[in-house]
């Protein structure tokens, strides 16, 4: 870390870096990452990476990202950027496309033959191979008050299976080459997330405090890291351990081994100013180390984590008298309002993606799944004129207690870029005109439009791609292939609701006659 630069950035940044954060009048028990690094270097190579925002729409618009992976429009994503492992080649970019090379490892003995590079995927460095005896250690401030945040590990790319035809697979593309291996995306979650409900941090608050996250597939290495953290002044109650089951995944640096990634999510901050400052300063106020033993450590494997099961045993419909009757009344009222001037098509949602380990064993793309939410998705459709529009409607999952927050997002193919999003915080009052006046549960439902222009107070505006000053993937033009997706984040179990305990959201696409 550049201490001079931090000092110039202000006292708060320096406090965040050194751990001198005050909690209820006391100094938080948080050591100095540099002391940890020094203590580990006797028996380990310690390389520093960075932890920072990955703006999927912006980077895709700049030609630096091949897919937006179904980004949750309105949320921010943060990732590790790591150097290759010791004695591993760096991935070569493509200058003609503006894709920079991966930064090389700092440990490269010319007398030792290197392991092959990671398959190149722009921006270089946010996906990486891992030896079974390596650890990643993150020292970071936690997001300010918000509706939701989490940190999750992922298997990002896996080697293509010999003689298998992937051309018909959804969201398939290829990276790599014959020398380092041919890969395709799985982007499947590994285990549980760390989130505001379970994080261990400096002052007991999940917001604005500090935490350490240790990622490892080897119990012996984890124990060594934990011992050094404690020796460096970090108390046990700020340390979070995330494990990777090395026998499940293809760990190692050799050709064809899996690549991994670490993803943070933040949604709906309470203070936009605090959030903007957090993201702008995250790279400077956080530290991430890649820790590699100088002598290989024998396997000390973790088993697959026992996950919290989805579901409470109570269906959402149980809290809503006449739920199907109310939904039918809403449907009829919506169609009656527009049917004279518009043709329409009704779309149902289905489970969009499998959970991570299921995707890995099926050898398909899970698009960065997260067990903290449910994912529903419609079939594809188009908007053919400026007068065409979309109506989404259904049960407000937050009002029924099945979600901490919920939203509907419009996506464009093939990039799966989220271009318009509406959140449950906007739903209050939106269904009143479509239900009988005596309906006491009107705010347990919602009706919202997505259109080219503001049709009423309950409309999200769909931007165009062509001529969009922010970038071409911030919108979609008429005729583009679109789909709707719906999320419901976290019920009382601490994970996403069961797909068999929620009322599925509905979509009507109206086309001008």
Over which residues does each language-model region extend?
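Secretory targeting and sorting signals
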Residues: 10-18
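Bacterial N-terminal signal peptides that target proteins for export
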Residues: 1-10
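Sec-dependent signal peptide cleavage junction
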Residues: 17-27
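A compositional/structural signature for long, glycine/proline-rich flexible linkers
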Residues: 25-513
């Amino acid at each position: 870390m550049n201490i001079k630069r931090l000092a110039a950035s202000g006292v708060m940044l320096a406090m965040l870096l050194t751990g001198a954060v005050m909690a209820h009048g006391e100094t938080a028990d948080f050591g100095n990452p540099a002391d940890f690094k020094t203590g580990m270097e006797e028996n380990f190579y310690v390389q520093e990476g960075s932890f920072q925002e990955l703006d999927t729409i912006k980077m895709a618009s700049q030609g630096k990202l091949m897919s937006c992976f179904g980004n949750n429009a309105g949320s921010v994503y943060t990732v590790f950027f790591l150097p290759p492992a010791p004695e591993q080649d760096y991935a070569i970019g493509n200058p003609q496309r503006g894709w920079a090379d991966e930064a090389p490892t700092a440990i490269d003995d010319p007398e030792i033959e290197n392991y092959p590079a990671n398959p190149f995927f722009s921006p270089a460095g946010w996906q990486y191979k891992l030896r079974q005896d390596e650890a990643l250690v993150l020292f970071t401030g936690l997001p300010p008050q918000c509706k939701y945040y989490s940190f999750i590990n992922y298997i990002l790319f896996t080697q293509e299976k010999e003689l298998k035809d992937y051309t018909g697979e959804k969201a398939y593309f290829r990276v790599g080459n014959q020398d380092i291996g041919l890969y395709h995306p799985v982007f499947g979650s590994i285990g549980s997330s760390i989130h505001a409900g379970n994080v261990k941090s400096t002052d007991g608050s999940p917001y604005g405090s500090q935490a350490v996250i240790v990622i490892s597939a080897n119990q012996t290495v984890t124990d060594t890291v934990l011992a050094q953290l404690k020796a460096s002044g970090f108390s046990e109650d700020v340390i979070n351990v995330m494990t990777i089951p090395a026998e499940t995944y293809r760990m190692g640096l050799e050709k064809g081994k899996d690549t991994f990634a670490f993803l943070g999510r933040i949604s709906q901050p309470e203070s936009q100013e605090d959030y903007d400052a957090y993201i702008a300063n995250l790279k400077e106020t956080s530290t991430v180390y890649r820790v590699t033993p100088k002598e290989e450590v024998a396997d000390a494997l973790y088993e697959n984590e026992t996950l919290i099961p989805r579901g409470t045993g109570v269906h959402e419909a149980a809290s809503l008298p006449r739920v199907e009757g109310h939904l039918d009344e809403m449907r009829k009222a919506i169609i009656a309002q527009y049917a004279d001037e518009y043709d329409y098509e009704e779309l149902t949602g289905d489970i969009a993606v499998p959970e991570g380990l299921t995707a890995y064993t099926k050898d398909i793309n899970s698009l960065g799944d997260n067990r903290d939410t449910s994912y529903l998705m419609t079939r594809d459709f188009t908007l053919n004129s400026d007068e065409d529009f979309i109506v989404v409607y259904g049960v407000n999952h937050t009002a029924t207690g099945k979600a901490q927050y919920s939203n509907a997002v419009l996506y464009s193919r093939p990039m799966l870029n989220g271009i318009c999003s509406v959140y449950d915080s906007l739903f209050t009052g939106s269904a009143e005109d479509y239900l009988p006046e005596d309906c006491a549960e009107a705010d347990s439902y919602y009706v919202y439009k997505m259109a080219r222009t503001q049709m009423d107070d309950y409309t999200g505006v769909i931007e165009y791609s062509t001529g969009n000053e922010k970038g071409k993937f911030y919108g979609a033009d008429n005729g583009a292939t679109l789909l709707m997706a719906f999320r419901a984040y976290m019920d009382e179990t601490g994970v996403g609701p069961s797909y068999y305990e929620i009322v599925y959201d509905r979509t009507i696409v109206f086309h001008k006659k």
